[in-house]
Amino acid sequence: FVEKPLKRMTIVKSVRKAAERQSLLAENRSLRNEIKLLTRREIVGSSPALRRVLDIATQAAPSSATVLVLGESGTGKELVARFIHEHSSRAKAPFVAVNCSAIPETILEAELFGHERGAFTGALARREGRFARAAGGTLFLDEIGELTPSVQVKLLRVLQEGEYEPVGGDTVRADVRVVAATNKDLRAEVAAGRFREDLFYRLNVIAVTAPPLRSRREDIPLLVDHFLGVYCAKNNRGRLEAPRDVLQVLTDYSWPGNVRELENVIERAVVLCRGDKVTVDDLPDVVRQGDAGEPSTLTFSVGTPLDEVERRLIRETLRHARGDKSLAAQLLGISTRTIYRKLGELE
């Protein structure tokens, strides 16, 4: 049979719709790629302090040496570790990050090294640990100063012998590069008997110190621009600008929470901003007033229960630290693991 001839306009409309659909698909792919690129965490800055860190990291990357990244909370120690991994021969293998302070002591060993079925009560199936998941790649151990003595011994064996034993299992060879990080003074921890001296020297083959943001203020405008791009994309809004007066306020602030605190401030500004430029009013009071580091005053009546004093003190310190548990622990003079435990008790 012979179909009736199609009208010319019908053909034109069909072609146009197909073209528009392809254009929209291409635009959608482009936007997704742009968001993926913008939201990828990366080291931003060009200050001498940051360049020194990257110079050492670049030299260390091709080697197999263990690296210890030092620095205050929020300075980007994990980003330095990722930089080392991405510039090493292990770049195509996994990068596995572990926050040692966020894992309860009772399961930390099994979490790192894995366990066999029936190794302990509740071990209903075999589970591989973080070392196994990082095989061929890099294992980043953040808050290394929080390791328990028993786990310190097992980690030392990995670094010395290149092998470990899963809980309830046989010896396994470890093909993993270890990069560790801490905001503690590990030499002081060694002197106090809380950290093994032999493990410290095994970790401290190459030391890199991530500088606090207050020592690289010239990077703040670059970081602000970067985070504006990230959070404008995440919140599906047009690109915002930060005028000179806003940048001046941000540059003058002391940033006790470092880059992580700056990122949180910019995310907040993107959400609250009503125009196409961030204003000083979009910034938190503590940043506008420049009173970072001045502790809030808490008053308690005589006879206030100790647990109530502790609860209010921890919550106020967390508020001051903008939810950064590591920074709050530093301000309180306790370990990060302790603050996680205390928060669990308060809930």
Locate predicted features.
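N-terminal accessory segments that target, anchor, or regulate ATP-driven/P-loop NTPase machines
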Residues: 1-37, 337, 343-344
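Hydrophobic face residues on amphipathic alpha-helices
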Residues: 2, 11, 15, 20, ...
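C-terminal output helix
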Residues: 2-15, 154, 171, 198, ...
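Residues within helix-turn-helix
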Residues: 9, 153, 260, 326-327, ...
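AAA+ ATPase active-site-proximal loops
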Residues: 32-173, 177-184, 189, 213, ...
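Conserved AAA+ ATPase core "coupling" helix
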Residues: 110, 191-233
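Bacterial C-terminal helix-turn-helix
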Residues: 240, 298-347
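Conserved C-terminal helix/linker of AAA+ ATPases
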Residues: 266, 273-288
